[in-house]
Amino acid sequence: MPKRVLQGVVISDKQDKTVVVKVERRFTHPVMKKTVRRSKNYHAHDENNVAKVGQTVFIEESRPYSKLKTWKLVEGGAEAVASEA
């Protein structure tokens, strides 16, 4: 089964080897037909402390690192993935 990959913005890098990433999703409301924005914060493992606040990054599902951390930062961040595409 493939691992899910999400794109978001780093909102906190104060913890050691951990970043908090805000991921926004958009959907059309079934009755109002209006685009609705919802966001969720994910704690992700950042082994080398490379991500900085405000940076756009990709996170990938992984094994549990702790009670809250079940995602990891994709190596290289958004710049590396964008250049490959």
From Swiss-Prot:
<dbReference type="GO" id="GO:0006412">
    <property type="term" value="P:translation"/>
</dbReference>
<dbReference type="InterPro" id="IPR012340">
    <property type="entry name" value="NA-bd_OB-fold"/>
</dbReference>
<keyword id="KW-0689">Ribosomal protein</keyword>
<comment type="similarity">
    <text>Belongs to the universal ribosomal protein uS17 family.</text>
</comment>
<keyword id="KW-0699">rRNA-binding</keyword>
<dbReference type="Pfam" id="PF00366">
    <property type="entry name" value="Ribosomal_S17"/>
</dbReference>
<comment type="subunit">
    <text>Part of the 30S ribosomal subunit.</text>
</comment>
<protein>
    <recommendedName>
        <fullName>Small ribosomal subunit protein uS17</fullName>
    </recommendedName>
</protein>
<dbReference type="GO" id="GO:0003735">
    <property type="term" value="F:structural constituent of ribosome"/>
</dbReference>
<dbReference type="InterPro" id="IPR019984">
    <property type="entry name" value="Ribosomal_uS17_bact/chlr"/>
</dbReference>
<dbReference type="GO" id="GO:0022627">
    <property type="term" value="C:cytosolic small ribosomal subunit"/>
</dbReference>
<dbReference type="InterPro" id="IPR000266">
    <property type="entry name" value="Ribosomal_uS17"/>
</dbReference>
<keyword id="KW-0687">Ribonucleoprotein</keyword>
<dbReference type="GO" id="GO:0019843">
    <property type="term" value="F:rRNA binding"/>
</dbReference>
<comment type="function">
    <text>One of the primary rRNA binding proteins, it binds specifically to the 5'-end of 16S ribosomal RNA.</text>
</comment>
<keyword id="KW-0694">RNA-binding</keyword>
